[in-house]
């Protein structure tokens, strides 16, 4: 009998494999992305200390007010520009992109490309 595959477990396994390859440092922190069915979240993390340096999500009032929907590609692109602006204000210019086990397409790709256009290097 074929066992049904749980997609979230597969994504978590992929994310753990990715996390074993790299981690955020003070000079080059990690840009971690998480997307749920309704919202997207992005954090810039220094893994040596375990601190979140910058965070943004589609739940924030400023972001949510400008968006028609919080779970589409346009929302992801706006989140990318917001996280990049916050990072540049804190003096963070280069990051390591952690897609969180999600496939690099659609919302994740839109967030990454918008962050690059706003000035983050990765």
Swiss-Prot record:
A single GO cellular-component term on record: ribonucleoprotein complex
UniProt key word Transcription: no
Family designation: Belongs to the universal ribosomal protein uL18 family.
Protein name as annotated: Large ribosomal subunit protein uL18
Record has Ribosomal protein as a keyword: yes
A single GO molecular function term of this UniProt record: 5S rRNA binding
Matches recorded under HAMAP family: Ribosomal_uL18_B
Key words of the record: Ribonucleoprotein, Ribosomal protein, RNA-binding, rRNA-binding
Organism: Lachnoclostridium phytofermentans (strain ATCC 700394 / DSM 18823 / ISDg) (Clostridium phytofermentans)
PANTHER family per record: 39S RIBOSOMAL PROTEIN L18, MITOCHONDRIAL (PTHR12899), LARGE RIBOSOMAL SUBUNIT PROTEIN UL18M (PTHR12899:SF3)
InterPro entries named in the record: Ribosomal_uL18_bac-type, Ribosomal_uL18_bac/euk
Signal peptide: none
Function: This is one of the proteins that bind and probably mediate the attachment of the 5S RNA into the large ribosomal subunit, where it forms part of the central protuberance.
Subunit and partners: Part of the 50S ribosomal subunit; part of the 5S rRNA/L5/L18/L25 subcomplex. Contacts the 5S and 23S rRNAs.
A biological process from GO: translation
């Amino acid at each position: 009998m074929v066992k049904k595959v749980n997609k979230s477990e597969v994504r978590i396994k992929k994310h753990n494999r990715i996390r074993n390859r790299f981690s955020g440092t003070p000079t080059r922190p990690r840009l971690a992305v998480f997307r749920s069915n309704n919202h997207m979240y992005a954090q810039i993390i220094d893994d040596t200390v375990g601190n979140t340096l910058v965070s943004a999500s589609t739940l924030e009032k400023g972001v949510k007010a400008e968006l028609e929907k919080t779970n589409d590609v346009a929302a992801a692109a706006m989140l990318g520009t917001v996280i990049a602006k916050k990072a540049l204000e804190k003096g963070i210019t280069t990051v390591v992109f952690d897609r969180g086990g999600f496939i690099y397409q659609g919302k994740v790709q839109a967030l990454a490309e918008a962050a690059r256009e706003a000035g983050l290097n990765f």
